[in-house]
Amino acid sequence: MSSAPRRPAKGADSFCTPEPESLGPGTPGFPEQEEDELHRTLGVERFEEILQEAGSRGGEEPGRSYGEEDFEYHRQSSHHIHHPLSTHLPPDARRRKTPQGPGRKPRRRPGASPTGETPTIEEGEEDEDEASEAEGARALTQPSPVSTPSSVQFFLQEDDSADRKAERTSPSSPAPLPHQEATPRASKGAQAGTQVEEAEAVAVASGTAGGDDGGASGRPLPKAQPGHRSYNLQERRRIGSMTGAEQALLPRVPTDEIEAQTLATADLDLMKSHRFEDVPGVRRHLVRKNAKGSTQSGREGREPGPTPRARPRAPHKPHEVFVELNELLLDKNQEPQWRETARWIKFEEDVEEETERWGKPHVASLSFRSLLELRRTLAHGAVLLDLDQQTLPGVAHQVVEQMVISDQIKAEDRANVLRALLLKHSHPSDEKDFSFPRNISAGSLGSLLGHHHGQGAESDPHVTEPLIGGVPETRLEVERERELPPPAPPAGITRSKSKHELKLLEKIPENAEATVVLVGCVEFLSRPTMAFVRLREAVELDAVLEVPVPVRFLFLLLGPSSANMDYHEIGRSISTLMSDKQFHEAAYLADEREDLLTAINAFLDCSVVLPPSEVQGEELLRSVAHFQRQMLKKREEQGRLLPTGAGLEPKSAQDKALLQMVEAAGAAEDDPLRRTGRPFGGLIRDVRRRYPHYLSDFRDALDPQCLAAVIFIYFAALSPAITFGGLLGEKTQDLIGVSELIMSTALQGVVFCLLGAQPLLVIGFSGPLLVFEEAFFSFCSSNHLEYLVGRVWIGFWLVLLALLMVALEGSFLVRFVSRFTQEIFAFLISLIFIYETFYKLVKIFQEHPLHGCSASNSSEVDGGENMTWAVARPTLGPGNRSLAGQSGQGKPRGQPNTALLSLVLMAGTFFIAFFLRKFKNSRFFPGRIRRVIGDFGVPIAILIMVLVDYSIEDTYTQKLSVPSGFSVTAPEKRGWVINPLGEKSPFPVWMMVASLLPAILVFILIFMETQITTLIISKKERMLQKGSGFHLDLLLIVAMGGICALFGLPWLAAATVRSVTHANALTVMSKAVAPGDKPKIQEVKEQRVTGLLVALLVGLSIVIGDLLRQIPLAVLFGIFLYMGVTSLNGIQFYERLHLLLMPPKHHPDVTYVKKVRTLRMHLFTALQLLCLALLWAVMSTAASLAFPFILILTVPLRMVVLTRIFTDREMKCLDANEAEPVFDEREGVDEYNEMPMPV
């Protein structure tokens, strides 16, 4: 600076003001006096004393550990950005020096290295230096008791101003030098952002007293608060062009104006280069790790004060993301505003320009050029990571300052860019609400409240000044807003969430953090400017987002329209990147710009580029999805191989430990089918696994969803009980009918729900058991054996077989029952259902043939027919029993229109139930109404067709046979207890032993249905928490069936469709599902109460016998047909039969088509078809009882024969179990698509 000799300043003498009486005529001129004062003030000794004095005021606690951010901060601020020489202590505050504590040791200043080398800085010393500066600044905030707030000055020119005021008391004092005096602000709404163009035009709108100087033209008012002074070195960063006295744009320049005027231009340039340019590798001190034990930062332990202390490192844990793209457009009044044009929760949703409504979610398609432009702008734009701001104006001010510093925009464009950032935000949902506008911008709120203030009231410059083209704002305005608490909302204005907002909030995850993307064209800029901001903490920015979600990231891109850049596409690109899981995790964990660029490169590596050719149809793009899946799979594999090198995952020890715990838990997962090698070991493990949750099985039922599930499952269980009961009565001549099946379902259901390991299973009668009952009844009738007595001995053998299977832990055998066997079984039962339906219908047409038009009135009709018609008429009354199953003269024959009405009832029931099931996944009505209608489709179809039949009084139809009260179906044939030794004649002893063979066959059916159903319910995708018990459930179901045979009740098994429906009804889906994404399971209400109540309600249904007697058998045939047709859904064998008649070019894009040659696929289908034909042939002969044995032979056939014909790769494609739980509402997809099992 100056080479003149200087006297070291002593104490407060360097700040003393000369006495007025000492200024006489003989006093030397003021220029010489000012130069002497300036030399004494700017002396090196004085500067060194200030540093020593500041360093003696305490510091941070030793032992603080530094990171790379601290070192970068130290290099950028402490060594290259110096404090202004005008920031001296006032006289009173300077006298109070903090004495050194008793434990404080004197230390050598690091800059006083005697050797002239670059000294090495201890970390503890660096902390103490920073703390000393901070406490020195805190001392400034405490005025002395004898001083008034207005007597505290902070700048050198203010000290000179005080000297000039004292000199003005002398008559001979000349005109004072230009100065500025700062006084405290009057109120929160003060006008503080006005830049002075002329000294005479200074406006004091908020009580801030400005000077009347004439030489300070072009400089803003300096900010000063009484008793308050704090330094933030990061905010003091400036470019060199701001330091000139004539071109100063900021109030606190790093050099004094007097000093700047005295120095030459070369000296000023040297000063700018020294203070503001960051030359890599120059004057960087070596940092040696300090071996102190304490790891707590000294900043944490300071007492609160006006000096902002450094906060701990910002949490970088990735959150779910919500991205909103806002573009700078003109509204209908031709005023600029930020308008939302797209949003991302997981997929992109665009606003349709014409209708102003949201389009369908879709995968964002980006142009490759926009991605490259985005990477280039990120490489050269402003990147602010962990910005500590809480309001949009504060963030905007920091962004604009960083743009000026990085020379992206000119200094004169600062105000325009700032005003552009603070424009109003509008959303498509704003116009849908007819109430008070939901999003209130700063400008509209100011205009709204302006009518309630008087003329003398002070106004906030944020809401009264125009947004574009007004007076530029200064740092004073934004800092004042940051320091003062946020204003309270005005009375009478409340922010209520609209219906649209609440619906959108349900789709957004609870802990999501938002990203705001602002892009647009502004003509006042000469080139594009960009800023990427990551806030230190997520904050809610008022009137910015469509929904109140805290904002963590902001991206800004402004530029002229003349630039060769598509701002909209670049905004879509960064929005899509932020919605990508890997990239937004990298954005959370990024420490510098290079991390973001690396994440963009990783995104480009997994992106798919389509050639610029015309696509004639969507089928041409089928390979894109497959190729993208391969790229994502490769990306996941690379992430698993290099989790730490990629920098995309947290590296903390806690996260690593948590990951290891999860992996260990997955590896040690308890497999319920794993054998223990001990007798009944699996049963004991099932009891130990499931019974500790017994009490919670009742507590978890206290939920409204469980009550709704009870009503739904009741009808789902009652309809098959009535249907199969009526058909079973037809097959067994009413030895077992509706009453027996209802009682069996109720009793076994209650016991199973109280003792079973998986209470979500619904046990009931099924098609395979119906086929076996018919076959065994035919066998007993042909051999003159008592059917019910034979069932008793089969029941005894069933119990022994179940005990033997559980003791040997044989439930693991269910793993060998592959899709090959399951599909053959399910297809066979579906064919039987369909065949039986039309067989019964043909039989009705044979018993009641169609007559000609004159036949009904002719006299050729004999008296027997007239008498049967007369007998048939009373059956239409509600109090008469149905004559179904009776022989002789009691059963009417040859009735007119009976066959046609039966056909109408059967077809009507089938089509109503079938289309109501389709309606469940249609697009009509809200989803909740559709699900209710679809779930109750079968009861609704039965009710409608019963009313149709009841309304036609002139036509006879055969009704369901149901007894009155608690009675068996045919009391004249049997009772409730069956004698094992024989009812009418002694039962043969050889048959008691031979009953083992049919018992094995029944056990095969029950084992397959129960265990496969348990496997389907227990899939990992269903997220069950309490586990299942294969051995315990099998033992209970088979043992109860054996005991129920003593009472003439039918055997039951786990009904697959009803069990899956029960589990789905108790599944709670997460509402935070992105539009277009698959629904996710939140929890499953695993409890016993719903199954228990359903079983009791089914048992009580026996009292509605009068209502059940009104159901025609033709309606049950329609339900039978419905179950047969719907069971074909999800059977891959049925789909491959279609491919036999389809050209290869029309084959679907599935695994077994793409990975297996067409001829080999057709060969596999032919083998399944051959096995199905063999089973059908067996069931059509007298050996139909052995069909379960033929079915189980398909298991070794698949394991031995097919593995020699097909390769392992082909078998994995053709025989893989790819069925997953179905929860979404895709058309034509429901529970039947999940299981290749019969109904």
Curated annotation (Swiss-Prot):
The modification N6-methyllysine is found at residue 272. Its main location: membrane. Residues 76-85, 94-110 have a biased composition (Basic residues). Residues 1-237, 285-318, 447-468 are annotated as: Disordered. Residues 845-895 are extracellular. Keywords: Anion exchange, Antiport, Cell membrane, Glycoprotein, Ion transport, Lipoprotein, Membrane, Methylation, Palmitate, Phosphoprotein, Transmembrane, Transmembrane helix, Transport. One of its GO terms (cellular component) is basolateral plasma membrane. Residues 706-1239, 708-1239 are annotated as: Membrane (anion exchange). Glycans are attached at residues 857, 866, 880. It is found in: Apical cell membrane; Basolateral cell membrane. This is Anion exchange protein 2. It comes from Pongo abelii. The gene is SLC4A2.
